[in-house]
């Protein structure tokens, strides 16, 4: 809002003088009411800050404070339009914001007086047209001009306004000077009264006098500025700086005339430093003629003073001045720099004078701020001065030391002073100060920024939000904390996770296991009376049971002879098991006797019950489980489906015997299985991988194997195969050695049997119906078909099956070899209208379980599966098994076909063979013969053809067993590692690996034969001999490889023999001096010499050919392929030059190896490279120009 009595008219005529006069009276009247108005000093100046007609300017200049009224920089200084406003404007704006907040925290009386005085001073000088450039910067209280000097200066700067304006201006100046004298006298009176008080207030009075001297010291500079202003260019004479007037509008006790004429200066001994500084300023303000003579040296000092640093030469006066001008020292120094830089028309002397005037104005500000009529202002200032007196003294000393060195750049000193002002200001109004975020950001990033300034800015904003650099260095740690993780850390994490699955090895000697009982079987009397012949006859009747072992119990005929409990017998009768099957009648007595058993029986013969019933008796004999104890019975299976089926077979007995069982397999949530194990379970049916996870989970606190005494490996041949054997053995090693182990399977290859026996103790082997034999109840059909006719034949078989009403509820199981084939066949059958589903290892476990259940329940009659469903799957209505893709070995075929014809039922197994699968026909024909069925003629032809190829060495007989899948890459890596070790650690005694060497030689021979054939074809096409090949060397000829000569072990010790051999060597060397024929080495008789060697002379070949056989890349390839050693020896001799006696032979290559074949292959490859290099050299020579265009003369 506008002030009382003010007019908003920008016209300088008629209204300004009256407005300023009313403003002075109104300001005195409303001083108290406006004391608490924090915005009055900004809002009240807005009317006068509009465009005004200047006395000597014909254009309007934009007042920046209209757009930025809150910018205190604009309130304190006004920059002419000819000034550069690029960089300094932003800096002043930022500091103006700080000043705005500092003013809010000042004493309210002082602020009101400052606003009043500035308003009055501005209104008195608003329309002055004859003020010089410097007088515009200084207000009436700092110019120190008397009325006489004003009148003298007016003619020098004629005013474009009317003569009435001159009279008004003179009257205003006279009143202002009288008011200033009155204020100075009042202040001096108060100082004398305070000095008379004495006592503890004397110290504070000393500080006030020092600060009060600063205007007196600075006042002589103003009259000196007047003659300098007279010499300024005309456009600056009639202008003034309204910002400077606003800033200096506080009632100034300084005199308008020369120092000492109107103001009584207090005499103090401590003012000597200030007086010396005053003398320096007076000397600096000499007329331009005098200043120009020493402008270079004076410029440094004056710049220092111009930036508010001239006071630093005055130690004591500056201490008090810095305290009183707490919030303005930084801004003043910045503002003076901004005013001096953009005045190119001015000379150095004028700039220096302006800088000195700025220092005077800065000092006068101190007096205006401190000089007042109210006691509380002085008390607050004195208290602040008393608190900081000691600190300011030390800073003043540092400032003096810096002042001694000349500062070529005033900006640097300005930063120091601004920091000093900020550091002092922090004690008074740290909570109110605000640092511009851009300044804080730049000060943090700039390495050349003074650290004190940055520290002060951060400390001054301690109670406010700290300015944060969004892309500063402090964020680098957060950004790179994860990304800069070392590879070792990740490897450590991976190893740690890997170690979690490792089961710690158990030292059974240190463990204390509870004793347990294995033997529960008591042979019935009728069986005990049976002779061995009768027992053998009984075994023959029971499907030809074959047993092997010591003290094998006789087979039982009824369940009552097995020594089972009443609860178990009740469940057996409830399940409808009338009599034991063949495998059950022999295996149950053997297991109940506490013996380790290997049971091999046909599919569907009841092997699961054969090991479950003895286990229940075994568990019931031991004490119940306590908290955190593991199972007693452990059953491991290769597939998840088989584990689920065994667990399902246990359930009828568990409830009757009050036992608990847990089925643990991969694919299912492990948390549920952990919860069940923690509740306690006597039986665990699991797959090996998931069991290892459970044993390693929670540092082994989930479960343990300390109480396991009964272990079953179902489908044992698969468990000891390449895929499961390491995991199974790891688990078995953690179980007590005196456990009882039972192995069951429908197939048991001989190599698997030998491996399994290592885990057993004096086992009894029971074989029912032969190993790997298809049950006779299964009808086997094998057809040889092309790939494109298999699907049509499958549709025909399914149509014939379901055409009979008796087979309406029949199931059909179709086996394929790959997961993709299962999904493809499923899609094709669904298109033909057959409801079916697929199951394979790529599906989720929940899908696999639900599919098996739906298939058993008859929801869909056809199931397409891989071999994952070949073992243990028991579906009673399954009447048809189709091997859409032939199994790759005998055991897989037996298990696939055994899914049908179970428990005495009949079934059909159809197998499709293609011409490319004759390798598999051998096992299928063998299964047909063992089961007593005729082998079809097309299948027999395929078998004969394959066996002939095996005899001829073109094919390799397939081994029995699964052997693992997808391990070819691992085999290759293992073989390569073994070969590298052999080459690295050669001993010359690797005679046992002849097969590997032959295989390697054959592969190398095939590889190089192709290369040689291409080279030979190229050579045959050429009718002329290859150009560039030396005479006597045939690259396509036979390669001669020699065995390395070794000194005999028992060399003769006769000196004459040694002399004779030496002479022979000399003669031989002389006879072949300089001649390096192929196959004649010179120096390969060292201890590292290979068993075979060959040489190839390359001296006379073209350079490209020599490079082809000696560069590192080609040689490395040959070394890797052949395992030989290739060395370049001899010296190169130009064409036509032969080596003399005793000289090195011509350049040649020595190839050494452990076998003749390897050396031959390496030599063949080197010759090929030589030929290619020679051809390339001849081709390049043919393309080369005959002569150049220029000759060197």
UniProtKB/Swiss-Prot annotation:
Top-level EC class: hydrolase
Q: What remark about domains does the record contain?
A: The Q motif is unique to and characteristic of the DEAD box family of RNA helicases and controls ATP binding and hydrolysis.
Q: Which residues form the Helicase ATP-binding domain?
A: 588-766
All copies of the Helicase C-terminal domain together span: 793-943
> Spans of biased composition, class Basic and acidic residues?
24-87, 94-153, 165-193, 384-393, 416-426, 966-989, 998-1009
Database matches in Pfam families: DEAD, Helicase_C, KH_12
What positions does the record give for the motif labelled Q motif? 557-585
Compartment(s): Nucleus
Organism encoding this protein: Neosartorya fischeri (strain ATCC 1020 / DSM 3700 / CBS 544.65 / FGSC A1164 / JCM 1740 / NRRL 181 / WB 181) (Aspergillus fischerianus)
- PANTHER family for the chain: ATP-DEPENDENT RNA HELICASE DBP3
Give its E.C. classification number.
Answer: 3.6.4.13
User: Coiled coil located at which positions?
Assistant: none
Keywords (alphabetical) are: ATP-binding, Helicase, Hydrolase, mRNA processing, mRNA splicing, Nucleotide-binding, Nucleus
| Primary localization | nucleus
Q: What is the gene called?
A: prp5
Protein name per the record: Pre-mRNA-processing ATP-dependent RNA helicase prp5
